């Protein structure tokens, strides 16, 4: 009789454990959706506590966006995931041609870096970005870019996304933008660690695998310089690159590489904050399984937030399911994952409720 009762209790308890894991895993996944109207499935996942955040694209933006964001926040607040702090909602508002919502910054990073008063312009750009995002009820920006371009018109310079071609201007402008933006109430993300400044024109990690064959010494004494300052300044998030850097890891792109993410960024550079991937569906990752498998690899590497930006709610859900399965099997460390969850909660606490 005791065995039967125990079996019945176990059968009841098992789903609760699964739900708890799904909620925990969900806080590590940032979802996206197509068009102007979110699908009901995404609202449902949010109410179940399986959505940790959103990324907004230009196709999602009209006059109804603030009300939609309020609805997501209300569902999140009523969900089992709520920890007293808001859901993180982000977009890419770098400036110039790279703006997802109406408003500033009107100048590109390159225009700011080339101006007569670059630090002042960068500070104003950070404030302008924050104002534009807050008007849409968005509380995080996947900007500024800290890549230091090597050639005029290369991948990162083509649309003016880099502040310049030397460590001084990128460090000073990137820091000014990030600090003023964060002080204005919007989370700042610096990207793309350890640097995409050497990528040639057309070498877009969103589309194809890219290898950046620089010496480790050059990366550490040049490309990483702006990140060291950002870390000292307490930057909110760091986004990793999807390029491969053979000088430290010839197999995995930086965002899937424990050598780059944990050993270099966390241990060597001392970063204790939140790390976020670039788009998990990127073409550069085609050799690393489906989106869920990539999410597990990134989590194993030490990344905290997985960016499911394919405009499909099922993409984020698939990543959550793979994370849960890996935690159950023990192929993803529960201890490390819980530490990662604490970092995300600490980040959320920086946002006003």
Curated annotation (Swiss-Prot):
The keyword Signal applies. It is found in: Secreted. Residues 94-119 are annotated as: Disordered. It holds the Pfam family Glyco_hydro_3. Keywords: Glycoprotein, Glycosidase, Hydrolase, Secreted, Signal. Glycans are attached at residues 165, 312. PANTHER family: BETA-HEXOSAMINIDASE-RELATED (PTHR30480), HYDROLASE, PUTATIVE (AFU_ORTHOLOGUE AFUA_4G13770)-RELATED (PTHR30480:SF14). This is Uncharacterized secreted glycosyl hydrolase ARB_06359. It comes from Arthroderma benhamiae (strain ATCC MYA-4681 / CBS 112371) (Trichophyton mentagrophytes).
